[in-house]
Amino acid sequence: MKRTEEVPVITNMAAGPFLSRELSALSDGAGVLLEPVPIPYMEYREHGGIYGKAGMVFIWLDLEGMLPGWDDGGGGLLEGCASLVERTYQELCGYLSSVSQAELLIALFENYSSPLAIVAGHESDMAVDGLNRRIQEGLSRQAVFLDMRHLIASVGTGSAYSPKDR
């Protein structure tokens, strides 16, 4: 019989059904059932008790959800936006580290508003990559980063979404 382990997921997206399926596939054969517990980003401080029991906390924020209109039209990321996002992550990770010993897993930003055909090399894509680098440099000792776009590119889309090939 598998034991169940709750994984708090701090997000500003409706990702519950997707995460349930993905975590279930990841834990196949591991003797543990990973159960996501979605926590709205704006309410993350209200759920302090769950972090202390968790082995990991997954943070998956959507830049567009945090800062609507972040792309200034020329593809550049305004410096103020980058600083705000950086401070937000530092505050979030600092709080989680103070209430828990859980491993922090952060999904890096992607430009979800760009069609896939123009993402690679597009100016706004480069701005998002620059923001991801800043976040990684600032929090490299506190968290593990998941770069989903590059991970999927390295294994191919067929394998990335297949539980058997994962």
Predicted features along the sequence, with ranges:
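Extracellular glycan-modifying ectodomains
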Residues: 1-166
